Regions:
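Structural motif
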Residues: 38-47
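Alpha-helical segments flanking ligand/cofactor-binding loops in enzyme cores
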Residues: 47, 51, 73, 93-96, ...
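A short beta-strand-loop structural module common to alpha/beta enzyme folds
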Residues: 28-39
Length: 144
């Protein structure tokens, strides 16, 4: 499995913990995030992750910023991306089962590092249920 990860300054500590967790599981990680606490612009780190997910060059993506909203809004501009903002593992389970989310967006300012590791574990272990949910996902793209 290969996962792309990106973060802004608010998510640096979380990203480092998530990368360590993923690598301990033998997962290849492409790190597009900052390693600094200096202020940066989150879209600069979202676009490489979303592009890799969109083009199916990685299996999944993880994005981390202060609220999670900016990274989710940016990632969801990509045609083949379904980015979900989550703040607990129950929501993570639903974005995978019902929405087949391929990018997990994490709000660093509203979660704890240990909680985020649990969320990532659920993200990796939860499968898409398909069925009626596949039909719904098929209706997401704009038909222009």
């Amino acid at each position: 499995m290969k996962i792309a990860i990106g973060n802004d300054h608010a998510g640096t500590e979380y990203k480092m913990a998530v990368v360590a967790y993923l690598e301990s599981k033998g997962i290849e990680v492409l790190n597009f995030g900052t390693d600094s606490l200096d202020s940066v612009d989150y879209p600069d780190f979202v676009h490489p992750v979303a592009s890799k997910v969109n083009d199916k060059q990685v299996d999944l993506g993880i994005l981390i910023c202060g609220s999670g909203n900016g990274v989710a809004m940016t990632a969801n501009k990509y045609q083949n991306v379904r980015a979900g903002l989550c703040w607990n593992k129950e929501i993570v389970q639903l974005i995978r089962e019902h929405n087949n989310a391929n990018i997990l967006c994490i709000p660093a300012r509203f979660t704890a590092v240990a909680q985020v590791i649990e969320m990532v574990q659920v993200y990796l272990e939860t499968a898409f249920l398909a069925g009626r949910h596949a039909n719904r996902i098929g209706k997401i793209p704009l038909q222009c």
